[in-house]
């Protein structure tokens, strides 16, 4: 089991390490937002992830499997949201703050 992530850089490195598994789940983009993106995380902070799936591939199984995989790899509670699920009030802030992780094609 991997140790718990403590920095934004550790999160990005681990996400890149599992890029092939992310592609198998039809993930096209991942964006980090929240306390880790702002370098304001605490020991009990969760990891906030914005996900974009390939067209027609967003489904319950891919969403839940992504959530389980991220929690396993990062060893933290993870909140995964899609662009479509964002509130019209907070969504623009999240989209502006999100730092997208490049993990190849």
Language-model features, listed with the residues they occupy:
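Short hydrophobic/aromatic beta-strand micro-patches
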Residues: 50-52
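Catalytic core of pol beta-like nucleotidyltransferases
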Residues: 1-29, 37-43, 56-105
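Conserved histidines in hydrophobic membrane contexts and catalytic metal-binding motifs
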Residues: 32
């Amino acid at each position: 089991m991997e140790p718990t992530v403590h920095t934004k850089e550790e999160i990005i490195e681990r996400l890149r390490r599992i890029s092939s598994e992310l592609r198998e789940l039809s993930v096209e983009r991942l964006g980090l937002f929240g306390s880790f993106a702002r370098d304001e995380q605490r020991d009990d902070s969760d990891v906030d992830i914005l996900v974009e799936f390939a067209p027609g591939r967003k489904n319950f199984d891919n969403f839940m499997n992504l959530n389980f995989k991220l929690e396993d790899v990062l060893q933290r509670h993870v909140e995964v949201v899609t662009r479509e699920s964002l509130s019209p009030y907070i969504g623009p802030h999240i989209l502006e703050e999100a730092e997208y992780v490049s993990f190849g094609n």
